[in-house]
Amino acid sequence: MAKMGGEEDYPLYFGAGPELLRVAAGLRKSMTPAEKVLWERLRRKQLKGYRFRRQHPLYRFVVDFFCYEALLIIEVD
């Protein structure tokens, strides 16, 4: 299990396998223009102190943005 600094234990990737982790890493390197704009607003806890992760693997999917604290997924199309 992975941990975020100071938070309780939780399964950060919720069962995502190694291949999906590699796919997510590749997607982080090739974000769309819309994803880049939103990421500039979400990164470094700029949104009320919430921490977001980009191109985050969950189960069998890679979500554009994920905030565990708020249990929030954001998809940009």
Regions of interest found by a model, annotated:
Residues 1-53:
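Solvent-exposed, charged helical/coil patches
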Residues 43-73:
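Active-site metal-binding core of divalent-cation-utilizing nuclease and nuclease-like domains
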